[in-house]
Amino acid sequence: MLKVLLVEDENLIRRGLQYKMDWTEVNCVVVGEAATGQEGLTQIKALRPDIVITDIRMPDMD
């Protein structure tokens, strides 16, 4: 399975992406999430995801 990281500052959208999509159907699993660009960068280094889904404009860092 491909590892997915969700990086989105709006909690409602982040939760929607995580729980409304059937990730296993597309051979993926959500391994982490982040609410800021800086958190996302830290998670990328720690989790080494295959796919990062991110917002374009984020607090701290785009």
Predicted regions and their residues:
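Receiver (REC) domain switch-region micro-motif
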Residues: 52
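Helix N-cap/capping motif at the beta->alpha junctions
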Residues: 33-42
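Conserved acidic carboxylate
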Residues: 8
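Active-site residues of response regulator receiver
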Residues: 55
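Receiver (REC) domain active-site loop signature in two-component systems and cognate sites
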Residues: 58
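Non-catalytic signal-transmission and effector/linker regions of two-component phosphorelay proteins
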Residues: 1-3
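Conserved catalytic motifs of ABC-family nucleotide-binding domains
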Residues: 48
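Two-component/phosphorelay signaling modules centered on CheY-like receiver
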Residues: 11-32
